[in-house]
């Protein structure tokens, strides 16, 4: 048996190694993963939640009709009462909403009144109707019109109706060019089989990402919205459509504080429910507000001794005014929450203009083409949706 001395054991290795030919390892075969990682976000959660449309737009100006029932609310518009406890005449905002025989009631009051006469915006009423006790009237009080009582054998009442309104939005063209040299197409690549196909996929991801961003935040020019030689035609996004149910932190009656909490969500849902037949089923938020929604359960969360999984996530919010799926998107402003009725929203392609690739003639040693898509947003009955703005983001 050979024995080594202490000096033999300390001898450095001097033979051939993987690094002998240089730091770039020129003698070794490359080991490159045959997959390409994409770090940029391209998910479109709102488009996924809305789903594919059942129809297409057939014009660059897509239109739809909206209607509403005759209103059953109004307000007192009179500050000159002689005795607000017994006066039988007062002025309202819209006298045309009332008919003789209407039972009416001031919101928050138990007194019933019967309309005896309507003259322009002036009402004559019978106070304390049905054995109720008269209560004080005041300017700006909301009046609920309960319903009309007709006389037996009476002639038909005057005709009343609503006019349908036409709403619309313009289509917007989304494009991207793909161009690859003949040599690049012929060469062998890591992670892909065809450079042209790969470039199409990447540009398509970008266009769909931009479509969702525009569906949420896009705006429409006040001049030449139909487009022109130098005017680009753009769609109006969801945020820009909303005007009725816009809630901001600091508004009167809106729950105090800048942080998102259940009180603010429920206030907005209740207001939308009270003023429309909208069925809000989507709550759309950014990442920061999603964490705020998750915290709604912090105080009531509990775990059994056998639980080994910690869950801190809310995907569905069930309220008295609807069951809402929580959708988290990167493209919504972080201080904003959208409350949407998905049955009234559609993202429509112009007929034959869903995203597609159009090969273009090549004038050299390359292949080229263009990805094209033309879309618009149909948002019906904007009063059936809502938005909360100005929330804290830190």
Language-model segments: residues:
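Cys-His-centered catalytic/binding microenvironment captured across papain-like cysteine peptidases
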Residues: 17-27, 110, 123-182
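Autoprocessing Asn-cyclization modules and mimics
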Residues: 14-135
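Alpha-helical scaffold segments that mediate packing/assembly in large oligomeric complexes
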Residues: 162-264
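Hydrophobic beta-strand signal
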Residues: 103-107, 144, 370
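Glycine-centered loop/turn motifs
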Residues: 82-89, 101, 137-144, 153-155, ...
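Long, well-ordered mid-to-C-terminal structural blocks that present hydrophobic/aromatic surfaces
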Residues: 250-318
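Sequence/fold signature of self-assembling virion shell proteins
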Residues: 3-56, 60, 65-67, 168-169, ...
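Intrinsically disordered or highly flexible coil/loop and linker segments, enriched in small
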Residues: 209-220, 278, 302, 306, ...
């Amino acid at each position: 048996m050979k024995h080594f001395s202490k000096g033999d054991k300390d001898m450095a290795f001097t033979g051939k190694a993987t690094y002998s030919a240089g730091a770039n390892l020129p003698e070794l075969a490359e080991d490159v993963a045959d997959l390409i990682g994409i770090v940029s976000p391209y998910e479109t959660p709102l488009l996924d939640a809305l789903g594919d449309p059942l129809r297409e737009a057939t014009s660059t100006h897509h239109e739809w009709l909206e209607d509403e029932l005759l209103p059953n609310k109004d307000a007192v518009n009179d500050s000159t009462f002689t005795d607000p406890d017994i006066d039988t005449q007062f002025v309202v905002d819209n006298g045309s909403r009332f008919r003789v025989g209407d039972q009416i009631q001031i919101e928050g009051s138990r007194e019933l009144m019967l309309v005896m006469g309507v003259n322009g915006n002036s009402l004559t009423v019978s106070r304390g109707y049905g054995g109720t006790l008269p209560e004080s009237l005041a300017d700006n009080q909301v009046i609920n019109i309960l319903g009309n009582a007709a006389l037996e054998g009476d002639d038909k009442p005057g005709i009343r109706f609503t006019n349908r309104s036409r709403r619309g939005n313009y289509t917007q063209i989304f494009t991207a060019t793909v161009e690859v040299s003949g040599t690049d197409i012929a060469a062998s690549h890591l992670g892909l089989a065809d450079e042209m196909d790969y470039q199409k996929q990447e540009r398509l991801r970008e266009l769909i990402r931009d479509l969702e961003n525009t569906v949420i935040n896009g705006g429409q020019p006040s001049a030449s919205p139909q487009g022109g030689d130098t005017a680009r035609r753009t769609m109006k996004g969801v945020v820009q459509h909303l005007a009725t149910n816009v809630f901001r932190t600091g508004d009167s009656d809106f729950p105090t504080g800048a942080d998102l909490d259940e009180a603010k969500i429920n206030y907005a849902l209740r207001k939308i429910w009270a003023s429309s037949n909208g069925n809000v089923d989507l709550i759309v938020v950014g990442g920061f507000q999603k964490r705020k929604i998750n915290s709604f359960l912090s105080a009531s969360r509990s775990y059994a001794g056998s639980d080994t999984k910690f869950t801190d996530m809310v995907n569905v919010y069930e309220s008295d005014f609807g069951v809402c799926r929580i959708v988290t998107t990167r493209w919504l402003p972080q201080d904003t929450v959208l409350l949407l009725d998905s049955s009234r929203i559609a993202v429509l392609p112009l007929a034959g203009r869903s995203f597609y690739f159009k090969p273009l003639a090549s004038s050299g040693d390359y292949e080229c083409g263009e990805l094209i898509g033309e879309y618009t947003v149909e948002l019906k009955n904007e009063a059936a949706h809502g938005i909360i703005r100005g929330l804290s983001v830190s």
